[in-house]
């Protein structure tokens, strides 16, 4: 049975799982691997299972083959806390969100870095999209113009993401008002940085960011609940058929992360697939 990891329980789990003085020397490779995945609807999960082949074609439909034993987390931050608190855990997050609370493993010999993505050696990355439905307000359009400008793409690069396009100088259209941006918890951190930078050059527009997941963000945009949706994946056919238009605002790597006390520093793509489909269940199995 899948286990939902609720943010409210993290503090309790931390007290129960933390071992004083734990280190790589104390790591018991015979222990079961704690597989940690994102929830259904997460764009990061969708990109992850596609990039590692953790899906199968069944009756014309793509089926997610993530093990039923996976712990399910509902955001990037909960994923990171869960892996940081469990010595035997493995998960995956946006590269732009990576910090020293967890350790990113090399994949097929390549490091999860912007440089390795740019030179083609690290192949686990996906687009960050924003989406709109039809015409948007002048305020929403002005914010989009800023995101895609030289200034906006500089913010993208400063925060460990990969800039896109051939940006031009930003010129405000003089808009005023409020813009609601909703969706992916992976896109949300860079969107927050873009909001902060934008409001310094146009304080007449208020940007509100609502963090959930990619699918919810797209549905909210379709329903007119928000002005701009955020997705950490390509849009689905059903979403574009509902009237959404996507724009890539950045590219982002997906880092496979383990606890800092885990001595493993590198895995192959096949090993990661084996772990997340439940074929490999202990850390010792990865050493064979």
Region roles according to the model:
Residues 4, 21-288:
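Exported/periplasmic ABC-transporter solute-binding proteins
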Residues 1-24:
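Sec-dependent N-terminal signal peptides of Gram-positive bacterial secreted proteins and lipoproteins
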